[in-house]
A protein has these predicted regions:
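Short, contiguous alpha-helical
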Residues: 30-34, 38-41, 49-92, 131-174
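Residues within well-ordered alpha-helical secondary structure of globular protein domains
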Residues: 10, 46, 69-72, 109, ...
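Short, low-complexity N-terminal intrinsically disordered segments enriched in polar/charged residues
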Residues: 20-30
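Sec-dependent N-terminal signal peptides
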Residues: 4-13
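Acidic/histidine-rich alpha-helical segments that form the ligand environment
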Residues: 95-130, 137-149
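Well-ordered alpha-helical scaffold segments within catalytic/enzyme domains
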Residues: 39-44, 78, 113-118
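Sec/Tat signal peptide C-region and signal peptidase I cleavage site
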Residues: 14-20
C-alpha cells in the first residue's frame, strides 16, 4: 500500500516540477517588471487605434494619455535615480503624442529604459538616498514607485479596454 501511495505521489508531482516557474513575484523585481511591461505592451497593441482617443468622461485621461503618462512618469522617476531624461522628451507630450504607433514606441522605450537601468544597479546603489519633490527616498524606493505606478495604470487600462470592447490578450488564454 505504501509503495502504491509513493508511486501515485511521484506521478502526480512530476507535472508540477516539469512546469516553467510563473513569471512575476517568484523572479523578484525583474520578473515583475517583465510581466507588467509585457501586459502594457500587449494591451496597447490589442487596442484599436480609434480607441486611443477614448476617455471615460470629459476631463479624464484618454487611453493614449494614460499610456503616455506611464512612459513620461517612467522617465521622470528614473531620472531621480540618476539616468538623464531623453533629450527628445518635451513638455506636454502626454496630450500631443496620440497615434498608436508613436504611443507604443514611447511606452516601449520607457519600459526598456527602466529595465536597463535596474539591471545596472548594485545592492549598494539601491540604498543611495535621492530627493524627489520635497522628500527623501532611496533608489530602491524609486524603483518600487515605478513598478507600483505601472501596475496602478495597468488596472486603469484594463478597465478602459473592457469598456471599449477590448479583452486583454492574456485573459483570452484562460
Amino acid at each position: 500500500m505504501r509503495k502504491a501511495i509513493l508511486v501515485l505521489l511521484l506521478v502526480c508531482a512530476r507535472p508540477v516540477f516539469g512546469q516553467a516557474p510563473p513569471e512575476g513575484i517568484w523572479q523578484g523585481y525583474d520578473g515583475e517588471w517583465r510581466h507588467v511591461s509585457k501586459q502594457l505592451v500587449d494591451l496597447a497593441e490589442a487596442t484599436p487605434e480609434d480607441k486611443f482617443s477614448w476617455r471615460p468622461a470629459p476631463g479624464v485621461r484618454s487611453t493614449s494619455e494614460v499610456y503616455m503618462h506611464i512612459a513620461l512618469a517612467n522617465f521622470y522617476l528614473l531620472s531621480v535615480t540618476g539616468p538623464k531624461m531623453p533629450a527628445d522628451l518635451k513638455e506636454g507630450m502626454e496630450k500631443t503624442v496620440t497615434s498608436k504607433p508613436e504611443v507604443i514606441a514611447w511606452l516601449k522605450r520607457s519600459l526598456d529604459a527602466v529595465k536597463e537601468a535596474h539591471a545596472s544597479v548594485t545592492p549598494k546603489d539601491l540604498e543611495r538616498k535621492v530627493r524627489i519633490e520635497d522628500r527623501d527616498a532611496t533608489v530602491d524606493g524609486m524603483y518600487l514607485r515605478i513598478i507600483v505606478h505601472a501596475n496602478e495604470h495597468m488596472g486603469q487600462l484594463v478597465a478602459y479596454a473592457r469598456m471599449t470592447g477590448v479583452a486583454p490578450p492574456w485573459s483570452k488564454k484562460e
